[in-house]
């Protein structure tokens, strides 16, 4: 090996990121590090398309399936875990692969040192979002943090709630916290950046094929296991695409066919949102692959 290299591979769900990462890892004798917020959770092996046992036996994979789904795992915790890996593997080539744009941005730009938000505050605002809707909370956000409100959509419920819960818990605006960032773990010019975006029709075909395969491999058993944990539906792991839809099927609220079609629809929409985010947030240093 000529020297340590760091490769970042981002892209929407079902774009072929993991296969590309595996190929490059074998060529570079590199480690693979998860950069996807859902693949960190235990239990959700099939539904989040985590690497197979064959993959992990071929190349060492880190930060996959090690977080209890009852926990609210944050980007700050992920950065802390990445930092430990960087200190452990000081000369090994690394590949960061996943579909969570916020993780990549935090890796390259650092994050704000926002204190942990108490669960009671977090749940209060999520319940208000469900009850009052994003637009009503958006108007409230304008009153407490106009700088941030100007930057986000009135329909972006998650970001609106995040800003309100931070203000509620800390008495400081999220826009204030965002000015105080940690030092990036990886310098922007010290990595190869690959953005994988297949043609839309091909991507949708892959999504449908993979979801059908997930059912054959036992995705419903994972949903049953999650249901037995009786976790709050507000937890991130319980919001993984496939969990709410198939729980509704198991509860007799819709047919299996309706649930599966809904999962396919939600996955397509998620992929579309990912693509939009990557194109709007990533700069020209990212090499676009199709």
UniProtKB/Swiss-Prot annotation:
ATP binds at residues 11-18. It comes from the Bacteria. Its cofactor is Mg(2+). Keywords: ATP-binding, Magnesium, Nucleotide-binding, Transferase, tRNA processing. Its EC number is 2.5.1.75. InterPro entries: Dimethylallyltransferase, IPT, P-loop_NTPase. It holds the Pfam family IPPT. One of its GO terms (molecular function) is ATP binding. The record marks 100, 122 as: Interaction with substrate tRNA. The keyword Cytoplasm does not apply. Monomer. Catalyzes the transfer of a dimethylallyl group onto the adenine at position 37 in tRNAs that read codons beginning with uridine, leading to the formation of N6-(dimethylallyl)adenosine (i(6)A). HAMAP family: IPP_trans (MF_00185). Belongs to the IPP transferase family. This is tRNA dimethylallyltransferase. It comes from Bartonella henselae (strain ATCC 49882 / DSM 28221 / CCUG 30454 / Houston 1) (Rochalimaea henselae). The lineage of its organism: Bacteria, Pseudomonadati, Pseudomonadota, Alphaproteobacteria, Hyphomicrobiales.
């Amino acid at each position: 090996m000529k020297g340590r290299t760091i490769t970042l591979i981002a892209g929407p769900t079902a774009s072929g990121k993991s296969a590309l990462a595996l190929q490059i890892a074998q060529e570079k004798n590199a480690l693979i590090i998860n950069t996807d917020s859902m693949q960190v959770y235990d239990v959700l092996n099939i539904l989040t398309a985590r690497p197979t046992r064959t993959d992990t036996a071929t190349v060492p994979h880190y930060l996959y399936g090690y977080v209890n789904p009852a926990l609210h795992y944050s980007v700050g915790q992920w950065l802390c875990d990445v930092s430990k890996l960087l200190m452990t593997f000081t000369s090994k080539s690394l590949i960061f692969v996943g579909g969570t744009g916020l993780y990549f941005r935090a890796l390259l730009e650092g994050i704000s040192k926002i204190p942990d938000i108490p669960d009671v505050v977090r749940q209060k605002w999520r319940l208000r979002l469900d009850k009052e809707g994003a637009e009503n909370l958006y108007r409230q956000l304008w009153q407490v943090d106009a700088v941030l409100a100007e930057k986000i959509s009135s329909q972006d419920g998650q970001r609106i709630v995040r800003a309100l819960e931070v203000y509620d818990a800390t008495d400081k605006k999220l826009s204030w916290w965002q000015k105080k960032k940690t030092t990036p773990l990886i310098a922007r010019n010290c990595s190869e950046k690959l953005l994988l975006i297949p043609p839309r029709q091909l991507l949708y075909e892959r999504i449908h094929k993979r979801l059908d395969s997930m059912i054959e491999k036992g995705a419903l058993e994972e949903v049953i296991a999650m249901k037995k944990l009786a976790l709050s539906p507000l937890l991130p792991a319980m919001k993984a695409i496939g969990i709410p839809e198939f729980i509704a099927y198991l509860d007799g609220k819709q047919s299996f066919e309706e649930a599966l079609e809904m999962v396919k629809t939600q996955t397509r929409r998620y992929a579309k949102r990912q693509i939009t985010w990557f194109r709007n947030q990533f700069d020209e240093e990212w090499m676009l692959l199709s």
